[in-house]
Design a protein with these regions (language model features):
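Catalytic cores of nucleotide-enabled group-transfer and carboxylate-activating enzymes in metabolic
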Residues: 129-133, 143-149, 159, 219-224, ...
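Positively charged, amphipathic and often flexible ligand-engagement surfaces
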Residues: 1-475
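Active-site-adjacent beta-strand anchor residues
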Residues: 227, 346, 536, 631, ...
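Short, structured beta/alpha segment
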Residues: 426, 430-589, 611, 618
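Rossmann-like NAD(P) dinucleotide-binding subdomain of oxidoreductase/dehydrogenase enzymes
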Residues: 588, 614-674
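Conserved hydrophobic/aromatic pocket- or pore-lining residues that grip, position, or stack substrates
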Residues: 151, 529, 565, 587, ...
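Extended hydrophobic-aromatic, low-complexity segments
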Residues: 343, 354-356, 424, 531-534, ...
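Active-site-adjacent "gating/activation" loops or surface patches in catalytic cores
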Residues: 200-204, 301, 515-527, 536, ...
Length: 674
């Protein structure tokens, strides 16, 4: 999905102008810093120089603040306090943490309470109090300084409809406040259990909530920006945004959406949004806003990809993300769509910010741009930009006092992002007084301007990759629910399997399919127990024949060489891998499993086959027992029986598979694959 916009090399010459303007903003920012902000910057700069202090700080916020048990919380606090150094925390705080850590042995409750109070106090500029009086007062002060706020109601990830509804109501309540006129909302925070495989169904569900949200916005004059974090939410969020705003009720409404530059697909979706918004603008005269950010979910995206065996969705390096960001700026600030698409430049990197402003100026679209920053992260810089004539919108997370634990994840993420060596904010605390750090950031900026011309805009998640078999075992990757080919294939198979009526499943003995008179019903637990197949039930004679057959075959099977068994297991693994979507579809109807539940089970079964293939040499001197009876449970109808069958076969035994009566259709898939 490449970008539809070519880069403009003429803009490269604006880099020198941006650098000069950045120096001016830094000087002005230093003048505007009050005593409190200067002290905070010294404290943070000191903290960032000491990895142990960073680790201790993350422990304090991410663990001590979240744990309800005072005993456990105090124990973790003592561990963190031991890591507190004078280098990272300064003499007073460093010694104080050690002393309080010792005190927590005898007075855990007051110590933990004091820690909570201190963390809240230190974070009050980053996370605002959601209580009406406090928030209204803060908004008033910001407005007096020419700053505006984009409110984001923080909270834990929603797990069910009840939690989603509570969050939704808290957002609606915030929108009804007279002082609030701009709010950001993640669709995943107001609709629970979004299923990416069923993207149409998920879009329908979120669209219902969006209509309520937009009606409230129209009534109270609030601008709504759709936020997102997870890569999987990107296509759904963009599609829902366009669908609802195309409806007659909302076609004349202004609204916004975020795009994350650390995802290559952002370029494709930006092009899609531009083309759509121009048509919509021609119909109604209403514009949209695209908020360009670099991305704030990198660690989670990488962890999820590694866990499932996927290719990570984001760019691989910070320099690539920077190049992607300025390429988006190049594509965004253009006169041909300036009326239809407003652009939010959301970055604390003054080099990128000033370059964007120079690009807008050179193209005559300065009125198209909003500068956006994070509340509490760079107050003086925000004021300096405002005084230079460019209004600033501050992204402001809010939470109620009794829900502060939900804000801890935000704090940890901000800390994790800003402590990266390549991150501009880490350098920003000293950059104006440190020529070396300024030069480092200047060079990174110039590199991003140059590399924007060549940075790929093709998906990195969906790149073709093959698993080469080696002597080292590797897990089978889980199917990627964001992969269009997989979605299409599994959807097709589910429809095919759900159309099956009165399938008959035989016994298989000595390679012969046997349909007996005595049969049992196979039902669909997800469809009120509807009967969709019948399976044959063996008699005593059938059992005796099966045992005799397996005993006779045992000598031949155990006589195969290690390499011959290895080849058979590898072939079986390949067959199972190719039949993944079919197996998922059968399990969904036979065991009532969702795609997310069934797919890892198929991958686990493939792992069993490949594991025993790569470790077959360990069974070379084993003595087969003979015939092994595998009787699996119904709740893991594919992986467990495959694991049992493969283990027995690898040791030279023969196997009789007696499936759970509730999931015979799944067992029939296993037999077909093996």
């Amino acid at each position: 999905m490449p970008s539809i916009f070519e880069t403009d090399t003429k803009l490269d010459q604006l880099a020198s102008v941006a650098i000069a303007r950045t120096k001016e903003l830094m000087k002005e920012s230093d003048k505007l810093r009050d005593r409190r902000e200067k002290a905070n910057r010294r404290r943070v700069a000191r903290l960032f120089k000491d990895p142990k202090a960073i680790e201790a700080t993350i422990t304090l916020t991410d663990e001590v603040m979240r744990i309800s048990s005072v005993t456990s919380s105090s124990r973790i606090f003592r561990r963190a306090a031991k890591k507190a150094s004078i280098l990272g925390f300064g003499p007073i705080n460093g010694i104080g943490l050690h002393a309080i850590g010792i005190l927590s042995n005898v007075l855990p409750k007051p110590v933990v309470a004091a820690v909570h109070q201190r963390v809240r106090a230190l974070s009050k500029d980053l996370i605002l109090a959601a209580e009406p009086a406090k928030l209204a007062k803060h908004l008033g002060k910001r407005t007096e300084k020419g700053l505006f706020l984009n409110i984001n109601v923080l909270g834990e990830a929603v797990l069910g409809d009840h939690e989603a509804e509570l969050r939704f109501q808290s957002i609606l309540e915030m929108m009804r406040r007279p002082e609030v006129n701009y709010i950001s909302v993640k669709l995943s925070s107001i609709v629970a259990q979004l299923i990416i495989i069923d993207i149409d169904g998920s879009i329908n569900r979120v669209s219902e909530k969006m209509r309520i949200l937009y009606r409230e916005a129209q009534q109270h004059g609030v601008f709504v920006n759709l936020d997102m974090e997870e890569y999987r939410d990107l296509p759904m969020t963009v599609a829902a945004f366009m669908r609802v705003l195309d409806e007659n009720e909302f076609v004349a409404m202004k609204a916004g959406i975020v795009l994350q530059a650390y995802l290559p697909e952002a370029h494709h979706f930006f092009g899609e949004l531009v083309q759509w918004s121009k048509q919509r603008y021609a119909r109604s005269g209403a514009s949209i806003k695209v908020r360009l950010v670099k991305g704030a979910n990198l660690a989670m995206e990488r962890a999820e990809a590694e866990l499932h065996g996927w290719s990570p969705a984001p760019y691989r390096s910070k320099s690539d993300v920077d190049a992607s960001f300025v390429r988006l700026v190049d594509a965004a600030l253009r006169p041909e769509h300036s009326s239809a698409v407003r652009i939010g430049i959301a970055s604390h990197n003054l080099f990128h910010m000033t370059w964007a402003l120079e690009v807008a100026k050179s193209r005559g679209v300065s009125e198209q741009v909003d500068i956006e920053m994070l509340e509490g992260m760079a107050n003086a810089e925000a004021l300096a930009v405002t005084r230079a004539g460019q209004p600033v919108l501050l992204y402001a997370p809010v939470t109620r006092k009794d829900d502060f634990a939900a804000a801890v994840a935000y704090l940890v993420r901000r800390l994790d992002e800003n402590t990266s060596d390549e991150n501009y904010l880490k350098a920003a605390f000293e950059i104006s007084q440190n020529p070396k750090k300024f030069k480092e950031q200047e060079d990174r900026f110039l590199r991003s301007i140059a590399e924007r011309h060549t940075i790929t805009t093709e998906s990195l998640r969906h790149i073709e990759h093959s698993q080469l078999m080696s002597s080292t075992f590797e897990n089978e990757p889980n199917a990627d629910p964001t992969e269009p080919k997989f979605i299409a294939a599994v959807t097709k198979e589910i429809r095919r399997v759900r159309a099956i009526k009165n399938q008959e499943i035989p016994l298989v003995i000595n390679g012969e399919e046997i349909f007996t008179k005595e049969q049992e019903e196979g039902t669909d637990p997800s469809d009120n127990g509807k009967i969709w197949y019948h399976y044959s039930v063996g008699s005593r004679k059938d059992v005796d024949t099966a045992i005799a057959t397996s005993q006779k075959a045992q000598e031949k099977w155990s006589g195969l060489s290690i390499q011959e068994r290895t080849d058979i297991f590898l072939k079986a693994a390949d067959v199972m891998a190719k039949a993944t979507t079919q197996t998922i579809a059968v399990m969904s109807r036979d065991a009532g499993k969702t795609v997310a539940e069934a797919d890892p089970e198929v991958a686990e079964a493939i792992d069993f086959a490949r594991f025993y293939a790569t470790t077959a040499q360990n069974f070379g001197e084993s003595t087969p027992l003979g015939t092994i009876l595998v009787i699996p449970p119904w709740n893991f109808p594919y992986a467990i029986p495959v694991g049992g069958v493969c283990a027995a076969l690898a040791a030279g035994n023969t196997v009789i598979l007696k499936p759970a009566p509730e999931t015979v259709a799944t067992a029939w898939e296993i037999v077909s694959h093996l």
